Regions:
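Flexible nucleotide-interacting loop at or near the entrance of a catalytic core
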Residues: 108-132
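Two-component/phosphorelay signaling modules centered on CheY-like receiver
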Residues: 11-29
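Acidic, metal-coordinating helix/loop segments flanking the phosphotransfer/catalytic sites
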Residues: 5, 30-48
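Acidic catalytic/metal-coordinating carboxylates
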Residues: 33, 59-62
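Active-site beta3 strand of CheY-like receiver
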Residues: 45-50, 55, 77
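The feature encodes the CheY-like receiver
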Residues: 14, 56, 84
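Short amphipathic alpha-helix used as the core "switch/output" element in two-component signaling
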Residues: 39, 61-73, 90
Length: 132
């Protein structure tokens, strides 16, 4: 079962998005900070991380940079309630799969997560073929 980690400091976002993704059949965990995200990723691999840009403490872009330094291979979907084009462009240049603005359209977010999972599957398949 595909696994998703939601990282957002707003309990309502974690609850609503987590509920919809669970209804889609995904295994979902949620944390409220960048630090908690990195700690969780140190213990468990996730296929997709839905990561808020504006987090208290370590923000989402810094968290994403640390994920890349640690070579964590999860697909990352960045979300933000402060639709800042500069942040979106920076996240995509860093390797984020996509950027979704809050107020989250749950249908759009599910579609983006589904596409990120498809991309993750293709990358894993490609690596397996290269290893032969």
């Amino acid at each position: 079962m595909p696994s998703i980690l939601i990282v957002d400091d707003e309990p309502g976002v974690r609850s609503a998005l987590g509920g919809v993704l669970r209804d889609e059949g995904y295994e979902v965990d949620a944390v409220d900070s960048g630090e908690a995200c990195l700690e969780r990723l140190g213990r468990q691999a996730y296929d997709v991380v839905v990561l808020d840009i504006w987090l208290p403490g370590m923000d989402g872009l810094a968290t994403f940079a640390r994920m890349r330094e640690r070579q964590i291979e999860s697909q990352v979907v960045m979300i933000s309630g402060h639709g800042n084009i500069e942040s979106a462009v920076r996240a995509i240049k860093m390797g984020a799969f996509d950027f979704v603005e809050k107020s989250l359209s749950l249908e759009k977010t599910v579609l983006v997560v589904r596409n990120a999972l498809r991309q993750r599957h293709l990358e894993a398949e490609n690596q397996a073929l290269r290893a032969r």
